[in-house]
From Swiss-Prot:
One of its GO terms (cellular component) is anchoring junction. This is Keratinocyte differentiation factor 1. The lineage of its organism: Eukaryota, Metazoa, Chordata, Craniata, Vertebrata. It is found in: Cytoplasm; Cell junction. It comes from the Eukaryota. Residues 1-16 have a biased composition (Pro residues). Pfam families: DUF4656.
Amino acid sequence: MPRPGQPRPSSGPPRLGPWERPSELCLETNDERSQPPPGRRTRRPDPKDPGHHGPESITFISGSAEPANEPPTCCLLWRPWGWDWCRAAFCFRRCRDCLQRCGACVRGCSPCLSAGDPIEGSAEAAWAKEHNGVPPSPDRAPPSRRDGQRLKTSMGSSFSYPDVKLKGIPVYPYRHATSPVPDVDSCCKEPLAEPPPTRHSLPSTFTNSPRGSEEYYSFHESDLDLPEMGSGSMSSREIDVLIFKKLTELFSVHQIDELAKCTSDTVFLEKTSKISDLISSITQDYHLDEQDAEGRLVRGIIRISTRKSRSRPQTSEGRSARSTAPAAAPDSGHETMLGSGLSQDELTVQISQETTADAIARKLRPYGAPGYPASQDSSFQGTDTDSSGAPLLQVYC
């Protein structure tokens, strides 16, 4: 029992005097990991609780309370002098490449930058704070995304190669700062230069017609009646018609067929003196070059040789000779049937007389005409041949 006035001894370990306290207990430790975080209290389970659940953790969440200042992730020391040392050494080591490129560390080590340096995340954070955490949309996009879209729009929607050319034409010709950027979906092509019109081209009326092809249309008889245009330039079709007339006047149909065998599509394989003179006259009369005149002449020869109607146009002498003869009816445009100069009334009918050979041949028939007397010749005994005795040819008027 302690005496009255004396302190009651504690049940713990005896206290040491100031002279007996060890010096090792004065060391300070900065390890705070063993301490529970503030705002969390643990309650042990009640022994009378039949469920015997584990310890409960009660967490107080306050919207007005500000989060506790956590130590920076850049280094372990979070004291002011330690952080200065960490910013000088550790951040410089991590962001050395970034400092060499842009002169400022913009990723990962933002604490090592000064307040005046441009930071990429500051604009993003300001935009997020302004829009109160609303997710970005096409109408509301952060600055980095707008810059990326602007760059993509200026370079094209599918790929970003500004020097691509298609058949020598730049696909994206609008790449200068002064020129406006065209629509992305539109095809950015420079208009092709229109070829100059040729001197001997077909008019628009012939181009739209079924016979508008300059090289493959065929002549009809009505084509030869086209009047020559003395004033002005002649069309290509009229030049070919005149060449057709010259060919039919100089050569016969057989000669034109032989000339067609000695030609390719547009060139003579062998030129005679008459062909050379004809080419030179065509070049002078119609103001064509020699190659064009030769090609037109070859096409005219091939066209004439492949026509179904091989009749040449009638000259003045032939027309006067034919004017006296009666005109024959046309049969589908081809003169295949010519009128005969003889009349049926002028023909004389001659009847041949029956000879012995005719009589023998008539007797050889197994079934002769009834009423013909039987032959008494020994070589034809027993045959039932009969003949009427009518002549071989009988005229019915």
